[in-house]
Regions:
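N-terminal active-site wall of soluble small-molecule enzyme domains
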Residues: 1-6
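Catalytic beta/alpha-barrel core
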Residues: 11-20, 89
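Terminal or standalone catalytic/regulatory effector modules within metabolic enzymes
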Residues: 180, 186-204
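Catalytic alpha/beta core domains of metabolic enzymes, predominantly
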Residues: 25, 32-183
Length: 204
């Protein structure tokens, strides 16, 4: 609460769970200070491996948030991505949950993208694959390192394919080489005036 009092921008509070104590402590503060909140889809029973149970927890949190006067846009749900090296179906479960959250609750989502690859080799490739599929399922944000090129390429590409990059503007701005513009400038500097020939068309 002390931080929310002095923070000048809109805060994203990390976090609220489906546990009763958490709901009654965090949500009133989020409402009071006009913040948004990350909703962790676990409750007193812990983290379920069943994506349908996690969906119900997320739904409960959203309903309680609305009871406190918060809107859907004020809640960002973390579906809790687990390491696929330990739970082989955790990636598929997370994708199923993300899709349901977006389609049924119309809520934004966030996740720790690198959790999925924990303990496995070539983590960047796995993270990139998960991010691409996550965006396709409706994932709207992720906690990740923007300096990791492979993951960032995957995010940009997935946004294009999913129709989230209007006219591919971000993709083009990032990857198109300004060859045409540079060449035209160079050519204009190198051009020499040609002698005029009577009766022939003149070209620059």
């Amino acid at each position: 609460a002390a931080v929310l009092k002095v923070y000048e921008c809109r805060a994203l509070v990390n976090s609220v769970t489906g546990e009763e104590e958490s709901l009654e402590t965090v949500l009133p503060l989020v409402k009071e200070f006009g913040a948004a909140v990350v909703a962790i889809s676990n409750d007193e029973t812990g983290i379920s491996e069943d994506p349908d149970k996690r969906f119900e927890v997320a739904k409960k949190i959203l309903q309680r948030a609305q009871d406190h006067g918060l809107g859907v846009a004020d809640v960002v749900v973390d579906p809790l991505v687990m390491p696929i090296g330990a739970l082989n179906l955790s990636g598929a479960s997370a994708l199923k949950l993300i899709r349901r959250l977006r389609e049924e609750l119309h809520v934004n989502t966030i996740c720790g993208a690198s959790n999925v690859s924990f303990g496995l080799p070539n983590r960047h490739s796995l993270n990139a694959s998960f991010l691409s599929m996550g965006i396709g399922a409706g994932l709207t944000s992720a906690i990740m390192n923007p300096l990791h090129i492979e993951e960032m390429n995957a995010v940009r590409g997935a946004n294009v394919i999913a129709g989230k990059d209007p006219e591919c503007r971000n993709w083009i701005a990032k990857y198109r080489e300004p060859i045409a513009g540079n060449n035209s400038k160079c050519l204009s500097r190198k051009r020499k005036r040609r002698p005029k020939a009577k009766g022939l068309p003149q070209y620059d």
